[in-house]
Amino acid sequence: MALPNQQTVDYPSFKLVIVGDGGTGKTTFVKRHLTGEFEKKYEPTIGVEVHPLDFFTNCGKIRFYCWDTAGQEKFGGLRDGYYIHGQCAIIMFDVTSRLTYKNVPTWHRDLCRVCENIPIVLCGNKVDVKNRQVKAKQVTFHRKKNLQYYEVSAKSNYNFEKPFLYLARKLAGDGNLHFVETPALAPPDVTIDLAAQQQHEAELAAAAAQPLPDDDDDLIE
């Protein structure tokens, strides 16, 4: 979904909207993809930066036009123009901030009000940071709404490709689609404790086997 002033491409392209509280790392995440950062365009009428992120799959090249809010969400909700024609989405929160997770349902509601039945990935960012406040087992919203969830670290590139691969498979209707080439990413700014993160992922898997809690606040006080 290209903007009027953007060049169209002769391979599949999709509008991907990225939402979440300010400071959760949405811009940092998108900017890891170097060609997308180099070719980004600013759309002044809506106040967004659009990053064209290309990925190479076994079925050919695809492009996500990633819409980044440029921080407007700090001043209230986003305008409908940001969401209109969105074909897929990422909702991001910060695992070091309980409030950003508490606000995920609001972002999900706003998104679904305009974009019905699109594939959505929930991402818990900043898993490289030691003082994690939202534990893996406390993340249950995706199970209630049938979303995919990934733990990511924008600054270390950990799991960078997973949300895009999931969305590409959903949009193509092909569960066997896979990336055949790694996109050029910015060098990691931090290193992640892989042993600790594997423990978090194990907790996540164990929690998925448990019944959902009855409360709506997902255990976050």
From Swiss-Prot:
Gene3D superfamilies: P-loop containing nucleotide triphosphate hydrolases. Residues 40-48 are annotated as: Switch-I. The keyword Cell wall biogenesis/degradation does not apply. Residues 71-87 are annotated as: Switch-II. Its main location: nucleus. Keywords: GTP-binding, Nucleotide-binding, Nucleus, Protein transport, Transport. The keyword Lyase does not apply. GO terms for cellular component: cytoplasm; nucleus. Residues 10-174 form the Small GTPase Ran-type domain. CDD domains: Ran. GTP binds at residues 21-28, 71, 125-128, 153-155. One of its GO terms (molecular function) is GTP binding. PROSITE patterns: RAN (PS51418). GO terms for biological process: protein import into nucleus; ribosomal subunit export from nucleus. GTP-binding protein involved in nucleocytoplasmic transport. Required for the import of protein into the nucleus and also for RNA export. Involved in chromatin condensation and control of cell cycle. Found in a nuclear export complex with RanGTP, exportin and pre-miRNA. Belongs to the small GTPase superfamily. Ran family. This is GTP-binding nuclear protein Ran-1.
